[in-house]
Swiss-Prot record:
It comes from Saccharomyces cerevisiae (strain ATCC 204508 / S288c). GO terms for cellular component: mitochondrial matrix; mitochondrion. Transmembrane segments: none annotated. This is NADH kinase POS5, mitochondrial. It comes from the Eukaryota. SUPFAM superfamilies: NAD kinase/diacylglycerol kinase-like. It catalyses: NADH + ATP = ADP + NADPH + H(+). Optimum pH is 8.5. The gene is POS5. It is an enzyme of class 2 (transferase). One of its GO terms (biological process) is iron-sulfur cluster assembly.
Length: 414
């Protein structure tokens, strides 16, 4: 892996929204062995519990209610992930008939033609796929399974942007696998461990971003597993950003932009911009400048309780031509920002608000934070292979501290 390559970079995705109601889901199955049903027929999602065992960095995944609804997403338009999805679904239908398989509407139509035979243990029972509008899928998912690379995980998790994310089981079938510890060949063994409450998970934090336009009193809220970054896009002008931390002015920077990353995202855009590599077990928020004009603006690692506010400024209080600043959350473009607009970035679980630094919305207040006794399940719990998946990742995928010695090149005469 090279310095300018961005890990965890999501591929371009196009979301498909169904306008069909739950009583008239009209999809062409294309196969007599497949039956497609509306996801609204399923019960609502059931949350898992996570217990910290002694002498472990991971948390045990415990199902208080039996696992029933599994949402599977894959890297689009690749034969390998399509074949893997059909194989995985067939295994679930044959070995776990009580498990319901949920897919996106376009995926249901795509793969339904690949089921060429009935179930071996029950020839009279067809393969059943549940699908429907995106929000209905979110409301009924117990477990998220991804088949692809890191971009597939980011896409799948983004569906649960402002809700609780289900446990994530990721199989590496893409170009990057920093977040995907399992080879697909292990899918039978791994799923058996998950459904029988014998799997362990690594907890990854999320950032919460509030975008406030200067002419509005409310904000738009999004969540990031990797990073949030402001950048100038295709504008020839550098951005001017006023940065505040916990209500205290930090600096005004003139730069291409700035990236705010989770420890998970420390190996993505932030790393390419010169930021540190941080273990996902470290509670922190990374602030990394992108090509700043001042060489003294170095990357920062802030406490996870920090409340970061960034306001779009202008040079000499004059608005330059085409001074639009781009905002991206996990690689997905958001609304453009102009002079006077602001973003507020905190950890998903909240922050300690100092007087005068409250968020522009009333969803969270200082009293709510202080008086809350019930812990909130936040972040993302990813099924892990070993205690040291992260160390394996930076060694095998990043080539951490690799030698620059050239290997002998073979010739035709060798």
């Amino acid at each position: 892996m090279f310095v300018r390559v961005k890990l965890n970079k999501p591929v371009k995705w196009y979301r498909f929204y169904s306008t069909l109601d739950s009583h008239s889901l009209k999809l062409q199955s294309g196969s007599k062995f497949v039956k497609i049903k509306p996801v609204n027929n399923l019960r609502s999602s059931s949350s898992a519990d996570f217990v910290s065992p002694p002498n472990s960095k991971l948390q045990s995944l415990i199902w208080q209610n039996p696992l029933q609804n599994v949402y599977i997403t894959k890297k689009p338009w690749t034969p390998s992930t399509r074949e893997a999805m059909v194989e995985f679904i067939t295994h679930l239908h044959e070995s776990y008939p009580e498990v319901n398989v949920i897919v996106q509407p376009d995926v249901a139509e795509e793969i339904s033609q690949d089921f060429k035979s009935p179930l071996e243990n029950d020839p009279n029972r067809p393969h059943i796929l549940y699908t429907g509008p995106e929000q209905d899928i979110v409301n009924r998912t117990d477990l998220l399974v991804t088949l692809g690379g890191d971009g597939t995980i980011l896409h799948g998790v983004s569906m649960f942007g402002n809700t609780q994310v289900p446990p994530v089981l990721a199989f590496a079938l893409g170009t990057l696998g920093f977040l995907s510890p399992f080879d697909f060949k292990e899918h039978k063994k791994v799923f058996q461990e998950v459904i029988s409450s014998r799997a362990k998970c690594l907890h990854r934090t999320r950032l919460e971003c509030h975008l406030k336009k200067k002419d509005s009193n409310s904000s738009i809220v999004t969540h990031a597993m990797n990073d949030i970054f402001l950048h100038r896009g295709n504008s020839p002008h550098l951005t001017n950003l006023d940065i505040f931390i916990d209500g205290e002015f930090l600096t005004r920077t003139t730069a291409d932009g700035v990236a705010l990353a989770t420890p998970t995202g420390s190996t993505a855009y932030s790393l390419s911009a010169g930021g540190s590599i941080v273990s996902p077990l470290v509670p922190a928020i990374l602030m990394t400048p992108i090509c700043p004009r001042s060489l003294s603006f170095r990357p920062l690692i802030l406490p996870h309780s920090s409340h970061i506010r960034i306001k779009i400024g202008s040079k000499l209080n004059q608005k330059p031509v085409n001074s639009v600043v781009k905002l991206s959350v996990d690689g997905i473009p958001q609304q453009d920002l102009d002079v006077g607009d602001e973003i507020y970035v905190i950890n998903e679980v909240g922050t300690i608000y100092i007087d005068g630094t409250q968020l522009p919305t009333t969803r969270k207040t200082e009293n709510d934070f202080n008086n809350s006794k019930k812990p909130k399940r936040s972040g993302i719990y990813c099924v892990a292979k070993t205690e040291n998946d992260w160390i394996r990742g930076i060694n095998e995928l990043l080539g951490f501290n690799s030698s620059f010695r050239l290997t002998k090149r073979q010739t035709d005469n060798d």
